[in-house]
From Swiss-Prot:
Compositional bias per record (Basic residues), positions renumbered to this chain: 188-202
One GO molecular-function entry: microtubule binding
Species per Swiss-Prot/TrEMBL record: Caenorhabditis elegans
Matches recorded under PANTHER family: HVA22-LIKE PROTEINS, LP05237P-RELATED
InterPro entries per UniProt: TB2_DP1_HVA22 (IPR004345)
Compartment(s): Membrane
Membrane topology: Multi-pass membrane protein
GO cellular component, as recorded: cytoplasmic microtubule; endoplasmic reticulum membrane; endoplasmic reticulum tubular network
Keyword NAD: no
Biological process terms in GO annotation: endoplasmic reticulum tubular network organization
Name under which the protein is recorded: Uncharacterized protein T19C3.4
Length: 229
């Protein structure tokens, strides 16, 4: 028999049927049935704990291991064998009665220790959460500062570029002024030449006029004709 089939039979016969019978005992308020199924659940809880341990040790090599588990469950449930009642009265109840005080003390210490441990974990988690929130806030502030620095640096770069372009324009204007000054300094020479040429031309014109005046003076004037009466 496979492990899956045995597990299915154990769950069906060992839990569902006893759960329904326990419901019937509670609903009818039958004290005898109630005690009977309470003893079964105590024994079945101990069996479930031991089963998980034995499966790690016996499941791979012990012959008919899964079949024996099914037989044991039916032995506990059977009204003829009354296996759960026998185990509870012969072994479980005397053992629990002997170690009841030790078990209660162990449970109480475990309860207090678990409470203290829970409080420690809670305080540590609060401190950790506080640190995480503070670190997140610091990171957010740092990112904001970095963004502001980037924006300021971008503005500075833009202003530097504007100043640089202004300086370049000023230098170009100064160069243009210097070039115009040099052109103005070079330009009077041809003007002087032109003025000298104009002066020479005026002189020639004046000399020509003088010569014409002298020739006109030297030519004898013709006598005026007398009018004919």
């Amino acid at each position: 028999m496979s492990e899956t089939l045995s597990r299915l039979l154990i769950i069906t016969a060992g839990t569902l049927y006893p759960a329904y019978r326990s419901y019937k005992a509670v609903r009818t308020k039958d004290t005898r049935e109630y005690v009977k199924w309470m003893m079964y659940w105590i024994v079945f809880a101990i069996y479930s704990f031991l089963e998980n341990l034995l499966d790690l040790v016996l499941a791979f090599w012990f012959p008919f291991y899964f079949q024996l588990k099914i037989v044991f469950i039916f032995w506990l449930l059977s009204p003829w064998t009354k296996g759960a009642s026998i185990l509870y009265r012969k072994w479980v109840h005397p053992t629990l009665n002997r170690h009841e005080k030790d078990i209660d003390a162990l449970l109480e210490s475990a309860k207090s220790e678990s409470y203290n441990q829970l409080m420690r974990i809670g305080s540590k988690s609060l401190v950790y959460a506080k640190d995480v929130v503070a670190e997140a806030a610091v990171r957010g502030q740092q990112q904001l500062v970095n963004q502001l620095q980037r924006s300021y640096s971008a503005n500075d770069v833009g202003s530097e570029r504007e100043a640089l372009t202004k300086n370049i324009n000023i230098v170009k204007i100064e160069e243009l002024d210097e070039n115009s000054d040099t052109d103005l300094q070079k330009s009077p020479r041809p003007r002087r030449r032109a003025s000298s040429r104009s002066r020479s031309r005026s002189r020639t014109i004046d000399s020509g006029a003088d010569s014409e005046f002298t020739t006109a003076a030297t030519i004898p004037r013709r006598s005026a004709r007398k009018p004919i009466h």
